[in-house]
From Swiss-Prot:
Domain of life the protein comes from: Bacteria
Gene3D superfamilies noted in UniProt: 3.30.160.810, Translation factors (2.40.30.10)
Keyword presence, Ribosomal protein: yes
GO cellular component: cytosolic large ribosomal subunit
Record-level Gene Ontology MF annotations: rRNA binding; structural constituent of ribosome
Family membership: Belongs to the universal ribosomal protein uL3 family.
Region feature Disordered, mapped onto this chain: 124-162
Name of the protein in question: Large ribosomal subunit protein uL3
Keywords: Ribonucleoprotein, Ribosomal protein, RNA-binding, rRNA-binding
Subunit structure: Part of the 50S ribosomal subunit. Forms a cluster with proteins L14 and L19.
SUPFAM superfamilies assigned to the protein according to its UniProt record, in alphabetical order: Translation proteins
NCBIfam families assigned: L3_bact
Protein purpose: One of the primary rRNA binding proteins, it binds directly near the 3'-end of the 23S rRNA, where it nucleates assembly of the 50S subunit.
Length: 218
């Protein structure tokens, strides 16, 4: 049973399928993650599993967090995530979550922070068309009109403008696992995932599997 796992993006490569076609893939070093806490309905009001990933130094973890992590075994972990489950039966504190819990062909959702690009303008951030570059034009990369004057006399909230681009958490849904390498803790996932190489990723079973009905399910 796959609950979810934390991993690190290694980069992109290509994978040849049975027909010899080159498929773009992302290599993810996932786990092993340690179960750091088990929650149940009696004590916490819901059932969940908390896992940790990525060892770190003692000076970077405060004392309460150290005490919490020491209950599940040796080694201080940098990243913690919690996953809701129906029941925690069969799981034990200090147990390991590995890529072996996943299988080839399984659909997963991958969450992570996108590459931060800093303050960006209208063209780069939103794909606006630029103005004329010659013939005396001074409106090269400006946005153009942002609204009327007297009415409404203001710029509506949510107007697409220049600002910080990237550096936000997003989820890429429905990616297919093409290969599981338990020896090297690797997941080979079809397509791209958020972030740059070295970024932390949260991989969990897909919430929605299969195509959505064209008529909305009616």
């Amino acid at each position: 049973m796959s609950i979810g796992i934390l991993g690190k993006k290694l980069g992109m490569s290509q994978f040849f399928d049975e027909q010899g076609r080159a498929v773009p893939v992302t290599l993810i070093e996932a786990g092993p993650c340690r179960i750091t806490q088990l929650k149940n309905d009696d004590t916490d009001g819901y059932s969940a599993v908390q896992i940790g990933f990525g060892e770190t130094r003692e000076k970077l973890i405060n004392k309460p967090a150290q005490g919490h992590l020491n209950k599940s075994g040796e080694g201080l972990l940098r990243h913690l995530r919690e996953y809701r489950v129906d029941s925690v039966e069969g799981l034990e504190l200090g147990g390991a979550i590995t890529v072996g819990d996943f299988e080839a062909g399984q659909k997963v959702d991958v969450s992570g922070d996108t590459v931060g690009r800093g303050f960006a303008g209208y063209q780069k951030r939103h794909g606006f068309s630029r103005g004329p570059m010659t013939h005396g034009s001074k409106n090269h990369r400006e946005p153009g009109s942002t609204g009327a004057g007297t009415t409404p006399g203001r710029i509506y909230p949510g107007k697409r403008m220049a600002g910080r681009y990237g550096g936000k958490k997003i989820t890429t849904r429905g990616l297919t696992i093409l290969k599981v390498d338990s020896e090297h803790n690797l997941l080979v996932v079809k397509g791209s995932v958020p972030g740059k190489p070295g970024a932390l990723l949260n991989i969990r079973p897909a919430l929605r599997v299969g195509a959505k009905p064209a008529n909305g399910g009616k």
